[in-house]
Regions:
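PLD/PLD-like phosphodiesterase catalytic module centered on the HKD motif
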Residues: 2-192
Length: 192
């Protein structure tokens, strides 16, 4: 999910109209394409400032040992198969309509990939999805918020009711965060 400047502006307009906007995407630790996270991450603060609710999928399954490549890049697809949970299907629920598909709503899906999606007009399905998100998001995703200094915090709601707060992308090293920031300056967002 790379909203781009135009997409971020559109989401802001929805909020101005009073529409609740909630996005669930992969955290860096659950992402199978680390470079995409670099371009998504630069829009988080702006989206949060505009009242867009952001959630990042937690890496639910962990292997005990990761390869050097996985440690450096954050990749979650090792040579012998997937080792962590990640989000691939996309869905949106808006005004009684539901979109379900593989389309990422980013430049790569628009211009480079072959993607598919369905729009289903069903208030009942939209309500069910909304209720499921309300019930399960805290267990499967970090909730992103802005602290009093305007910096992102990640809230991890535990089964015992405790909330763990992170001030950096959970599950990342300083090197990975530096690389994410460096890559975000490359002029390749249109390919993400």
């Amino acid at each position: 999910f790379v909203p781009t400047q135009q997409g971020t502006y559109y989401l802001k307009l929805l909020r101005v109209e009073g529409i609740k906007v909630r996005a669930l995407t992969n955290s860096f630790a659950a992402n199978d394409v680390a470079i995409v996270h670099a371009f998504y991450s630069q829009y988080r603060v702006e989206m949060l400032k505009n009242g867009i609710e952001l959630y990042e999928f937690k890496p639910v399954l962990e292997r005990r040992r990761r390869t050097w490549y996985e440690i450096v890049t954050g990749s979650v697809i090792p040579a012998k198969g997937k080792n962590k949970s990640s989000l691939h299907a996309k869905f949106f629920d808006v005004d009684g309509k539901v979109f379900i598909g593989s389309f990422n709503f980013d430049p790569r899906s628009t211009y480079l990939n072959t993607e598919v999606g369905l729009v289903i007009e069903s208030s009942q399905l939209q309500t069910q999805i909304s209720v499921m998100l309300d019930q399960h998001l805290p267990q499967v995703a970090y909730q992103l918020k802005l602290n009093s200094q305007g910096q992102i915090t990640w809230l991890d709601y535990q089964a015992n009711g405790q909330v763990i707060e992170y001030d950096k992308d959970p599950g990342t090293s300083r090197f990975q965060r530096t690389m994410i920031k460096a890559v975000s300056y490359l002029p390749i967002e249109w390919m993400m």
